[in-house]
Structures are given as structure tokens and as C-alpha cells.
Curated annotation (Swiss-Prot):
This is Small ribosomal subunit protein uS3. Belongs to the universal ribosomal protein uS3 family. Part of the 30S ribosomal subunit. Forms a tight complex with proteins S10 and S14. GO terms for biological process: translation. Pfam families: KH_2 (PF07650), Ribosomal_S3_C (PF00189). It comes from Pectobacterium carotovorum subsp. carotovorum (strain PC1).
Length: 233
């Protein structure tokens, strides 16, 4: 059977940035890693209904900065910023250093693999037919400009006795092309028949120039100079 490498892991440092960007010496590394895990676990549980796509953690000069990428920033911030202040205090207690929380809005949740997977999961838990949920996700992504999308669900689909896997793809999803900007994520639907796994791959286009192109806008290409023909004497 064909085995596939994790699409995000193989592209780290090529076209994908890390979710934790900090440096620590040998003594502090394990503590930082543990607090990162606890912060992510707490925020994921606390913001379960806030459509959180990604949590980025930075550690500048004995402090911690957490950026929450969400499709519903209003739910995270709360009334007059009360909810985000509560989150900041808990994160500071977990990490043991002063904390800062930034909110980044996801403009197109239909093109975010994590949010698409979570959307399909919630539909499956509400007993929506899995084929309808998959097709709707694919159509929405392609309508908003995705170059390709693949959705896979596996488990006791429709309450069947034997578990199986079904997938639906539209466009192209080049997993072997390292410069391809492929967003991949998974989710689990807990139904009365058991757990149904959901995987989503979204191809947004190719990134030329590696990480430098991801962080900086592309410069216009220089036009070649026209050669002047010398007249005969």
C-alpha cells in the first residue's frame, strides 16, 4: 500500500513556516516545549467553537507571544476584550512568564484545511450525509479560488457494519511538488457508530523562491535592455 509523508512536515523551511518560532539552550528546551504543548491544549479546548485554524507561539526576551488564527475573532476577544484578557492570564500562569495574545483573522475559512475538516466533522456529528458534506466543502473551496482539493473520510460511514474509506477530489493536488502550497489537516467526528476520521488537502498554487517569497512580496522582474544597432559609416 502507498504510504504518504506528512504534507506539512516535508515542506517545513521550504514553503511552510514553523508553528513555534523560538530558540532555547539545552536546559530550557524541554520546559519550553512542555509549556508550548500545555498552552496549545488549553487554547484548543477553551476556543473549541471559535473556529481556530492555527496557534503560533514566539518567545521574545523572557516572555511569550501567542498568535491565534481564527475565523471568528469576535468570539475569542469577547465583550470589551474580557475573554482575551482571561486567556492572557491563564497562558502567563502556564508559561510562567508575561504573555501577550494577538488575534489574526482567517479571511477565507473555506480555503483553510483545519477549518474545512472541522466543518465536515460537525456536519457528520449532526447526522448530515457524508457525501453531501464532502461535496459541499469541495465546491466551496474551488469557488473561492483553490487550485485543487481532496477530502477523505474513513470509518463506519452511514452506520455500516464494516469500516471503509471514501474520498473526493477536484482539481490537482501535487503532493510530490515541494514548492506547492498544500494545506493539510485532520479532524475526528465522534458519532454514535464510532469515530470517523476526516482528512483535507487544499492546493493553493506554487510558491517560487522558497521561504523568502512567503515572507516578502515578489519583486517585479527586470526587463532586458534593448540593444541599439550601430549605423554604417
Amino acid at each position: 500500500m502507498g504510504q504518504k509523508v506528512h504534507p506539512n512536515g516535508i515542506r517545513l523551511g521550504i514553503v511552510k513556516p514553523w508553528n513555534s518560532t523560538w530558540y532555547a539552550n539545552t536546559k530550557e528546551f524541554a520546559d519550553n516545549l512542555d509549556s508550548d504543548f500545555k498552552v496549545r491544549k488549553y487554547l484548543t479546548k477553551e476556543l473549541e467553537k471559535a473556529s481556530v485554524s492555527r496557534i503560533v507561539i514566539e518567545r521574545p526576551a523572557k516572555s511569550i507571544r501567542v498568535t491565534i488564527h481564527t475565523a471568528r475573532p469576535g468570539i475569542v476577544i469577547g465583550k470589551k476584550g474580557e475573554d482575551v484578557e482571561k486567556l492572557r492570564k491563564v497562558v502567563a500562569d502556564i508559561a510562567g512568564v508575561p504573555a501577550q495574545i494577538n488575534i489574526a483573522e482567517v479571511r477565507k475559512p473555506e480555503l483553510d484545511a483545519k477549518l474545512v475538516a472541522d466543518s465536515i466533522t460537525s456536519q457528520l456529528e449532526r447526522r448530515v450525509m457524508f457525501r453531501r458534506a464532502m461535496k459541499r466543502a469541495v465546491q466551496n473551496a474551488m469557488r473561492l479560488g483553490a487550485k485543487g482539493i481532496k477530502v477523505e473520510v474513513s470509518g463506519r460511514l452511514g452506520g455500516a457494519e464494516i469500516a471503509r474509506t471514501e474520498w473526493y477530489r477536484e482539481g490537482r493536488v501535487p503532493l510530490h511538488t515541494l514548492r506547492a502550497d498544500i494545506d493539510y489537516n485532520t479532524s475526528e467526528a465522534h458519532t454514535t457508530y464510532g469515530v470517523i476520521g476526516v482528512k483535507v488537502w487544499i492546493f493553493k498554487g506554487e510558491i517560487l523562491g522558497g521561504m523568502a517569497a512567503v515572507e516578502q512580496p515578489e519583486k517585479p522582474a527586470a526587463q532586458p535592455k534593448k540593444q541599439q544597432r550601430k549605423g554604417r559609416k
